Amino acid sequence: MTIRFGYRDVNYPSGIIGELRDSSHLLGNVPALRQQMAEDGFLFLRGLIDRQKVLKARKTVLQHLEAHEALVPDTPLLDGVMGGRSPQMMGRKGVAYHPDVLDVIESEELFRFFDAYFAEPSITYNYKWLRAVGNEEYTGAHMDFVYMGRGSANLHTTWVPFGDIPVEQGTLVMCPESNHLDSFARIRDTYGRLDVDRDLVEGWFTKDPMEITDKFGSHWLTTNFEAGDVMIFGMHTMHASTTNLTTRWRISCDIRFQPASDPVDERWKHKGTGHTAANLPVKPIEEARAEWGV
């Protein structure tokens, strides 16, 4: 099938964007999970969270969107048909902190996983990146370190789809081995040390994810996600998303977990500042890349 990746139309599955492999068979084998993370830069775990909890949370978020006139009237609520601009849902309050939503993004399944993975108690940022991504929207290629690199060296992102999300609706796309391939070393040593608030530079490495693999190697992987699936990855794994070609909101949430004993990025602590450069002029990433030689 033809999908859109950034602004390019590509075939899926193909050598350009292949199919993710499920690592859930490794659950309970922490050394194997850590090895897989070190090799690929991510873990795709199907059905880690109870599906019914996720669907309940999806309904709650859609009711919130409906109340803010972001859905087409007289269409099935659970279809999530776009009818207006999505309200802001990220943060430390509002619908992101509804008990139904917290039952997913602060679920016992996630804490149980990370407590075992870190071999110590885990904590999660209280800031929640809950999103509704609309038609023709996508996420450019980037590494998460640039947004939250001041704390734990063992910080991990967890991406949770709120419902079944086919590739054409805007799924997460991973660039395997970008966390350690030699061909990505220059990126990791320049862009990968960026702090968007300190350095006042745009956060996406490129708006054209295909540029990454064209210039630096590796490939891209995604899948049709289902409610209950999670993607877990480190701060220096390059990732992006497909473009939402549907008329339905793609609802998802990014959350972060780390060992409780590690330092926490002060921007994302309880009552932290969040991004301090949000309203300041920033250097275009193209200028920064020219200076870095990447």
Regions found by a protein language model. Name each.
Residues T2-S23, L71-P73, F184-G192, A227-I232, ...:
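Non-heme Fe(II)/2-oxoglutarate
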Residues L110, M143-L155, S218, F225, ...:
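A short beta-loop-beta micro-motif enriched in histidine and acidic residues
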Residues E120, V133-E136, I165-V167, H180, ...:
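Short, charged/polar surface micro-motifs in flexible loops or helix N-caps
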Residues E120-Y127, E137-T139, N154-V160, G170, ...:
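Generic beta-strand structural signal
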Residues M148-V167, N224-A227, I232, R256-P259:
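Short, conserved beta-strand element in jelly-roll/cupin
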